Amino acid sequence: MKLHTLVSCLHDFPVVPKENPEITSIEADSRKVKEGSLFVCMKGYTVDSHDFAKQAAAQGAAAIVAERPIDVDVPVVLVKNTFRSLAVLADYFYGQPTHKLHLIGITGTNGKTTTSHIMDEIMRAHGHKTGLIGTINMKIGDETFEVKNTTPDALTLQQTFSKMVEQGVDSTVMEVSSHALDLGRVHGCDYDVAVFTNLTQDHLDYHKTMEEYKHAKGLLFAQLGNSYNHNREKYAVLNSDDNVTEEYMRSTAATVVTYGIDTTSDIMAKNIVMTSGGTTFTLVTPYESVNVTMKLIGKFNVYNVLAATAAGLVSGVKLETIIAVIKDLAGVPGRFEVVDGGQNYTVIVDYAHTPDSLENVLKTAKQFAKGDVYCIVGCGGDRDRTKRPIMASVATKYATHAIYTSDNPRSEDPAAILDDMVHGASGKNYEMIIDRKEAIHHAIAKAKADDIIIIAGKGHETYQIIGKEVHHFDDREVAKEAITGRLNNEE
């Protein structure tokens, strides 16, 4: 593709050189540049790839996209924002693949992963070959890949969509992070359905204020409907019980469908009953009301199911198909996942890493707990410090015993993170154990019959970041090891 043809998709008045070389690939990593590449420079948090433009040119780059003039011997296209330009260029270069997909985007603080997995199952049951992009993994049909970010970088994203189309995928569900929206990674993505789960405190190390965080999430809905395929109706699926929904309603040009429990909505759940074995409720839709029994536990999972149900219905899936999927749902790795080693107490691993998600998990555990509730929780280093005392407060409020421990301390002193947390502790029902493995073993050693242990924060993650080192660490493995060790000692 010729350079002038490619950059014609940019609408922010780029400064385009006279030269018009052939472009054979797009790269954002100078180490991957080869003959014919278009190298896009981006200023990140720690590295500014404008500094590698000469290296890219030396490796054969045919042209460079930058935010400032660069002294190189190849054509330079100047744009205002290279992050957003990369997304639009990649979409155009790969043939605008999302035009050929039914694309469902899910955003919100909590519930994105579970909702996306439920939605993937619903679309499969409807006969689609599906794609899935999310926190845990990426799927193309039945093939699974590891991921680094909730939402991949723009180039990887469009390459993935292109691969999905090539392999016959016709419906894709993806988690859309606030970072991806703010940085413009999803510019060029033609969403058919956008789903909002909820908005609670998180990522304030990046967004600084809740107002900025709310605005970033809202971009998915503000941009929905202002897109390419005007012959396809767009839908915004919004949680009526969240107080930002009215603002998102006003910002979108799409058709709005609501779901909720406490507020009158298009899709509702009533008569909710929870036990340790699952949840039953009445699913109320504009078409009919149906009694539903599912294995998933917790009010938060009812919200996830309602969101997926609404998205499924606007995607043309029959209600009976959706109900059948809900009844068979087995859960998502690291989301209220029970670790069973034959013990007489319950151990649950959950990704809860925000005050709201931790409160939801602990409230759910208390609803069916016959004994004490333990909560093992930490807060990430180099991340939002303001939520540390709040997390600690939630743990001591809802758990019988709270254990504060490490959770990816990164460059910070783990003891200092725990000190920040302790400021929010109410009461004396907590202890601090810096070593996460020791904390898990300690709780499991103390647990009595019918107690519940919640190991919060990591969920599906299999690593612990200490300094710049990434160590293997899986809460589920450590818990199973501790359970087995205790059982062996008791024999």
Curated annotation (Swiss-Prot):
Placement of sequence motif Meso-diaminopimelate recognition motif: 407-410
Subcellular location, principal: cytoplasm
Modified residues (N6-carboxylysine): 217
One of the GO BP terms on file: cell division
Location relative to the cell: Cytoplasm
Pfam families: Mur_ligase, Mur_ligase_C, Mur_ligase_M
Origin: domain of life: Bacteria
Cofactor entry: Mg(2+)
Positions of UDP-N-acetyl-alpha-D-muramoyl-L-alanyl-D-glutamate binding: 30, 149-151, 177, 185
Organism whose genome encodes this protein: Bacillus cereus (strain ATCC 14579 / DSM 31 / CCUG 7414 / JCM 2152 / NBRC 15305 / NCIMB 9373 / NCTC 2599 / NRRL B-3711)
Family (UniProt): Belongs to the MurCDEF family. MurE subfamily.
Residue sites binding ATP per the record: 108-114
GO-annotated molecular function: ATP binding; magnesium ion binding; UDP-N-acetylmuramoylalanyl-D-glutamate-2,6-diaminopimelate ligase activity
Pathway: Cell wall biogenesis; peptidoglycan biosynthesis
Binding site for meso-2,6-diaminopimelate: 383, 407-410, 457, 461
Function: Catalyzes the addition of meso-diaminopimelic acid to the nucleotide precursor UDP-N-acetylmuramoyl-L-alanyl-D-glutamate (UMAG) in the biosynthesis of bacterial cell-wall peptidoglycan.
Record note on pH: Optimum pH is 8.5.
PTM comment, free text: Carboxylation is probably crucial for Mg(2+) binding and, consequently, for the gamma-phosphate positioning of ATP.
Native organism taxonomy: Bacteria, Bacillati, Bacillota, Bacilli, Bacillales
One cellular component term from this protein's GO annotations in UniProt: cytoplasm
Enzyme Commission no: 6.3.2.13
Keywords on record: ATP-binding, Cell cycle, Cell division, Cell shape, Cell wall biogenesis/degradation, Cytoplasm, Ligase, Magnesium, Nucleotide-binding, Peptidoglycan synthesis
Reaction catalysed by this enzyme: UDP-N-acetyl-alpha-D-muramoyl-L-alanyl-D-glutamate + meso-2,6-diaminopimelate + ATP = UDP-N-acetyl-alpha-D-muramoyl-L-alanyl-gamma-D-glutamyl-meso-2,6-diaminopimelate + ADP + phosphate + H(+)
Protein name: UDP-N-acetylmuramoyl-L-alanyl-D-glutamate--2,6-diaminopimelate ligase
